[in-house]
């Protein structure tokens, strides 16, 4: 046990010296579960994902349609505002910029922010330029497996740091909503 604690501390110091561990963060190999309230159920027959607001035309996709969209796989470091960081996490899902490239979503020129709408009325916003970066993903999978309900199954927004890409904005992990149902531009 003490060997693993010592190794974690060594890794933490190495990550900090490499600039991957932000000040005040602690390195973890676990994936903590943090949310308030109950975990919503999922019914593929009635679930939908919507895009609306400052877009040329609203979009609504059911679960099967959403899963037909081109997939993106990313390796990201995640930093939670509760002071933990996890490195080299593997995610799969749909990049918002793919929705634009496919012509499914066309933001109007005045669109500047994107509000993520999730179950239980939770919302969180990000600047449009962050949502269109490669470090923002509408994630369905983590480490090769579908998300677990506690981690946002079936869909969550994920924003993290891509190692060796310091030019990307790195908002903390909480800026990605669990149990995501739509995006409002």
Where are the regions that the model predicts?
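Structured, non-membrane catalytic/scaffold regions adjacent to prosthetic-group chemistry
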Residues: 2-185
């Amino acid at each position: 046990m003490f060997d693993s604690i010592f190794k974690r501390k060594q890794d933490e110091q190495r990550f900090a010296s490499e600039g991957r561990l932000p000040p005040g963060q602690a390195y973890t190999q676990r994936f903590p579960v943090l949310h308030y309230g109950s975990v919503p159920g999922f019914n593929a027959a009635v679930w939908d994902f919507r895009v609306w607001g400052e877009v040329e035309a609203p979009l609504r996709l059911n679960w099967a349609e959403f899963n037909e969209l081109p997939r993106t796989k990313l390796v990201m470091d995640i930093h939670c505002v509760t002071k933990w960081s996890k490195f080299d996490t593997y995610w799969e899902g749909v990049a918002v910029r793919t929705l634009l490239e496919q012509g499914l979503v066309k933001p109007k020129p005045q669109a500047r922010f994107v509000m993520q709408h999730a179950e239980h009325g939770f919302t969180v916003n990000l600047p449009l330029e962050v949502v269109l970066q490669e470090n923002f993903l509408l994630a369905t999978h983590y480490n090769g497996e579908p998300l677990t309900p506690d981690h946002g199954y079936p869909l969550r927004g994920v924003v993290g740091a891509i190692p060796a890409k310091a030019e990307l904005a790195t908002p903390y992990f909480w800026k990605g909503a669990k149990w995501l149902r739509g995006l409002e531009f």
